[in-house]
Amino acid sequence: MSGVTARMENSIITTDSGILFFDQNWTQVSSGGHQFQHISAFAYDEVKQKLYFSDLKDPKFRIFSLDANPQEEYHKVTKLLPKSDETAYITGLVFDHLERKLYWTERGTHALYSVEVDKIGNGTDAGSLISTVTKVEDNHDLAGLAIDECRRHLYWTNSYLQTSNVVRATMAGKVLNSHTEDVYEPKGIAVDHYSNRIYWVEKKFGRAFSIQSVNLEVEDVKTFISENDKAPTHVALNSRYLYWVDQQVGEVHETLKSDSTQSRVVYRGNRPTAIIIKSALLLNHQNNNPSCKSVIAKILDNVKRESEGELPQADKPTSAKPEMIICLNNGILNHNTNSCICLPEYQGNFCEIPICNNYCVHGKCVIGRDNRPTCECDAKFEGERCDRSKCDGFCLNSGNCSFSDATATCACPKNFSGKRCETAICTSDYCYNGRCMVEEGGSPKCQCNVGYRGERCEEYTCNNYCLNDGKCVLNNETMLVECRCGAEYTGKRCEIPKRFCSLDTGNPELQPYCDGIPLSSQQQQQQLVEPQISYCKNSFNRTVVYASLAFAASLFILMVILLIVRRFYEEGRPRITKRFKVTSNHTQMTSRPATQCEITIENCCNMNVCETPCFDTNLLQKSSSKAEDKQYLLDDIENIAGSYRKLPSCAGGDKNLP
């Protein structure tokens, strides 16, 4: 490997036992800084391949640098910034390649600081180079820090419970906006240049935690992971994966960005604190990003000018041996690492290998926004490198694949159908009791086993075959079903009463059954068709039914006649007619004097006796002749003790009532 030109994505993890370096397969290749056991934050310089970090327990210095080239056995550590009386717990650290500045946050002082690293060590007091970018309120705890070098923004997290939020600010520290909704205790934060989003880890209530994301304007909140029983503190990203550190169990997790359920542990060991993906993200992978082009062009121009001696070469090792390096295909020599920074189309130690060289097997190679090669495949091929025919494995069940207008189609064998021959026409359970065969039209057909019938051989042949309690059996010689009838029936299905055999039915087809003459094999085959069962019209049962119906009808008519005769000769009850005669001297009921007659009427059914006649109910219950009824009525009219009487008027005058 030679500097930043290598496409391998190396990783760096800080632990309680030092700084560990890994290759792209997460195999440890080297380590350094073993004297530092409480590293709280660190940042990476891609141009000079230096690691900047802070150690909580060091009594004199707050920030150190370490040569991060994994090819070297010994990683030199340099003390950069001394501590002061105000120096507090450093929680976040980032590096800006354009201005070559370090930015960091301190929790105790509630401030964001910066320093130009190339000016340190030139005889100037390092403490005087530190600038205060901004201060936050005392009820804010600065935690994680991230930088968007392309768009020139800073992001930090505030983990104070009452005011917790995620902040976006300018490089000068001016707050632009923040995200506060449902933010509990955010910690590590990182910028994803590939998807233009911000990710941070956050402690939730109780044992819960989550990894959240927003866009670069800290809007459009999405939950990436939400789980329990872990304590994540730091997060980093590359083009495909998100990495997060769990200090509680000492693990580093790798989670697929496109599917958060796909995750694995890539490191387990001494308590990890932070992680950096050293993948030349800025210089190599973002050179085609429109938002990054102008910034990266300036960075590369500074590298070129420094290599050519136009700019002072700060912090260059004096013991380095000169080596002649020539970068091909307009590559830029980085004197700090003595390696080449290649254009997006080339790779190799000297930028000598076109990145698209033999990359696409059957297609055209193009360079994406992340400077990675991608393939535009020919019509009949697919895959990351167009190395797989669309017909490979497309047709199932021995189907033959062919192309029709660059679309893969399948010619299926006889027993299968579907776009990919995935559907079996004759499934194992299609014919219940038989063998399935495919007809010429592609439809399934069942050949039933002996003793079964139906479209899918679902019906036992003997089911409901023999009538009148006949017993169905299978003939072992002919393999046909036969009926063993009782004493009163005969026929193929025991459908003919034997008593009809003595009658002259005129049906010669029934005669062989009645006579007991065995049928020929041809007749037996014809009898496989179930005969239509018919019955004699003059049967005994029908005669009984008709006779019963006739008797019931006659009885009903007789009863109707008797009721009519009885009604005709029955004597009617007398009808009483009441007449009222009105004269001129008759006083109306409403105009009579106040003095009224008090009348006691016994057994009267209506109190208004002057208007309504009354009857003696006892007399009505007696059976008497018509003449006797009239006599009783006349007697009651004359007799004041009867059920009905005429009342004198209250005035005592003559009454003209009848």
From Swiss-Prot:
A biological process term (GO) from this entry: oogenesis
Positions of glycan attachment: 25, 122, 400, 415, 476, 541
Function: Has a role in spermatogenesis and oogenesis.
Localization of this protein: Cell membrane
Transmembrane intervals: 544-564
Protein name in the entry: Protein cueball
A GO molecular-function annotation: Wnt-protein binding
Family classification: Belongs to the cueball family.
Cytoplasmic side: 565-658
Organism (species): Culex quinquefasciatus
Main localization, broad class: membrane
Keyword check for RNA-binding: no
Protein's UniProt keywords contain Transcription regulation: no
Disulfide bond sites: 356-365, 360-375, 391-401, 395-410, 412-421, 462-472, 466-483, 485-494
LDL-receptor class B repeats: 100-142, 152-195, 196-241
